[in-house]
Amino acid sequence: MIVGSEKFQYKWIENWVTIPDTPSGKQNGRTHGVVVTEENQIVIFNQANPAILTFDDDGKLINSWGERFAGAHGLTLVKTNGEEFLWLTDEFSGEVVKTDLDGKEVQKIHKPEISFYHTEKYSPTWVAEFEEGKRGNGDIWITDGYGSSLVHRYDKQGNYMLTLNGEEGAGKFNCPHSLFIDYRKNDP
């Protein structure tokens, strides 16, 4: 079966992937993130245990980890100094972490210490990194889509810089679910 249209057509391959033989693996939780690495490995971030599943392009499971991410949501693949990393958000625990492809944590971003969160919920949904290898400065942007409908900016070391609620533009945000940086033009 072919799905999609025009130049974005794909062949659907039934039972392409081998799911881990665990109760939650067979159930396969909600999947919010899928990325493809430079080596054509498919990384899936889902609300099951384990949360990260990595498959080769033949559908064989080659790695799994991330048992702590019950609220798996945002998955972003970035490249830093020639190495690929994953940004992960957990909507339940509020965790935002950067890991290598094997799950080793290399950076953690905490909820901003702003008065707004003394009474309001924080539930991050996505991360975008303004990658230095793509003419960026390394800044990290995080959406709080399922909490307070805010977007936070951090520098590359993880120091909080500012918060946007959308009123700076056309109107207040309503569940900013994800965000991406468009590198297709000279001025991203």
Q: Which positions does each model-derived feature cover?
A:
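Conserved beta-strand positions in repeat-built beta-propeller and related beta-rich domains
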Residues: 44-47, 86-92, 131, 142-145, ...
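Structural signal for beta-propeller blades
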Residues: 50-53, 94-97, 106, 149-151
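Short loop/turn segments that connect beta-strands within beta-propeller blades
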Residues: 56-60, 100-104, 155-159
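A short beta-strand motif characteristic of beta-propeller blades
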Residues: 14-24, 60-66, 107-118, 160-170
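Blade/loop signatures of beta-propeller domains
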Residues: 1-15
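Beta-rich, blade/repeat-based domains predominating
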Residues: 24-39, 68-84, 114-139, 169-188
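Beta-propeller domains
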Residues: 9, 32-33, 37-39, 43-67
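A detector of repeated loop/turn-to-beta-strand junctions in beta-rich toroidal repeat architectures
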Residues: 49, 93, 121, 147-148, ...
